[in-house]
Design a protein with these regions (language model features):
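Glycine/tryptophan-enriched, flexible segments
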Residues: 127, 148-300, 408-423
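Intrinsically disordered, low-complexity boundary segments flanking structured domains
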Residues: 20-22, 62-65, 117-118, 139-143, ...
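Short coil/turn segments at secondary-structure junctions
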Residues: 45-49, 197, 317
Length: 423
């Protein structure tokens, strides 16, 4: 009998999941496992511990996946041991004497290095490794260009995909076989109470992801006004709020795309329904940017050579992250982040610009703080957007400074948002 270790990373679902599909189609025994991430000691800005809301959302999503396995008579092993991801995964593979390791490949540099190290360990022991792309709408071999020729800016990328490619089809959930290794259901310990002001009052997990999608598309049809409302900052429905579920893979981009197309076919299509797909394409672009550029995504100079260096002043950074800069819009957004683990896209652009262009700090500290605090943190999107604001990304216009007073006047003219978080 052939046995594989099925490693879950940021693909915490059973449906439309290539590693899951492959494992249960090709191996007699499957051991599903999730390894709680360790802090990255090589991070250029050091380590900020995860915020309590991120801890809670991740824990809820992992527990929800475990419950799905229990329904099928299986167990999800949740490993919280000390050591690196590579050490812990290889130790499990050795302990259970598996024939293969099956998992999702990640686009960011550190995760790519993990995969290479696991490949090396496995090759020395005649263990197969199989990696599948799970973050993207499109399969790499079906992109209308080689990765090395990825367009330098978003618009030509989007136009080529829309002209020459189609997102991959959604995969069915395979028939699961009972796990050869049984364990008691994992119970999360992280729990953060919900702030009633939160624009993201949702739990993590597959069921919560589909509940949100059904609400936003089918129950309320809010998708039909998405383009007009997406720059809001208060309330749950000004935007889709799919990002946290996408970041952890509680739902896939392909599943969301399929539901958008079904909605357009059965209900209506307009500029707003297209715009939600447009935003999925922005996310897609950052995934491939991360895979192409690797470690450069995390360097101060980003994708551009010889950019001037920024300083790091601890006092100014603390004012920024604590929401005490004296700029009402910036402070309100940073306090929302601390209280909920979420911030609107409009808010993220403003606080990022303020850190880089007003406080003149190294953008990587802001990106690292977002990484620690955001429940929807995705390395490719987070660091890609920070590079963009800092002027060291693919599209290197040097000065993307947001006038926060003008932004507040335009997007919060009555001061409702600022008053909500500063009162």
């Amino acid at each position: 009998m052939k046995t594989c270790l099925l490693w879950f990373r940021n693909n915490l679902r059973l449906s439309d999941n290539l590693p899951v599909y492959h494992a249960y189609q090709h191996y007699d025994q499957v051991i599903p496992v999730y390894l709680y991430p360790t802090q990255n000691a090589e991070h250029p800005t050091g380590n900020f511990p995860w915020g309590k809301h991120k801890q809670t959302f991740v824990a809820q999503s992992v527990a929800a996946l475990g419950q799905l396995f229990e329904v099928h008579g299986c167990s999800l092993l949740v490993d919280e041991n000390e050591g690196t991801i590579v050490e812990r995964l290889c130790a499990l593979a050795a302990m259970y004497e598996v024939d293969a390791i099956v998992g999702s490949t990640e686009p960011a540099y550190n995760e790519q290095m993990e995969e290479l190290a696991i490949d090396q360990w496995a090759a020395e022991r005649n263990v197969e490794t199989h990696w599948f792309e799970e973050r993207t709408l499109f399969e790499q071999h079906k992109l209308p260009f080689e990765l090395a020729d990825l367009p330098q800016s978003f618009t030509p990328f989007r136009k080529k995909l829309e002209k020459y490619s189609q997102p991959a089809a959604v995969l069915p959930e395979p028939t699961l076989t009972p796990s050869p290794v049984r364990s008691a259901p994992w119970t999360p310990t992280a729990h953060a109470s919900l702030d009633q002001r939160s624009a993201h009052p949702f739990q993590g997990g597959v069921s919560a992801a589909w509940d949100r999608l059904d609400h936003y598309l089918w129950d309320t049809e809010h998708i039909t006004t998405y383009k007009e409302t997406r720059n809001g900052m208060l309330g749950a429905d000004f935007s889709s709020k799919f990002s946290a579920f996408l970041a952890l893979g509680c739902i896939s981009a392909r599943e969301i795309y399929a539901e958008i197309k079904r909605f357009e076919h059965q209900i209506t299509s307009n500029e707003s329904t297209y715009w939600l797909y447009f935003e999925l394409l922005w996310r897609e672009y950052f995934q491939w940017i991360a895979r192409k550029h690797g470690r450069d995504l995390f360097l101060q100079g980003g994708l551009q050579p010889a950019k001037p260096k920024k300083n790091f002043r601890n006092k100014h950074f603390d004012m920024w992250k604590n929401g005490t800069t004296g700029d009402p819009l910036v402070d309100a957004n940073m306090r929302e982040l601390a209280a909920t683990g979420f911030m609107s896209n409009r808010g993220r652009q403003n606080v990022a610009s303020y850190l880089v262009h007003d406080l003149h700090l190294d953008w990587r500290y802001g990106a690292a703080w977002f990484e620690a605090m955001l429940i929807d943190h995705d390395p490719a999107s987070n660091y890609g957007n920070w590079l963009y604001i800092a002027g060291v990304g693919n599209d290197p216009r040097p000065f993307r400074k947001f006038n926060t007073a003008f932004q507040a006047e335009r997007y919060d003219p009555q001061g409702e948002y600022v008053n909500t978080w500063l009162d």
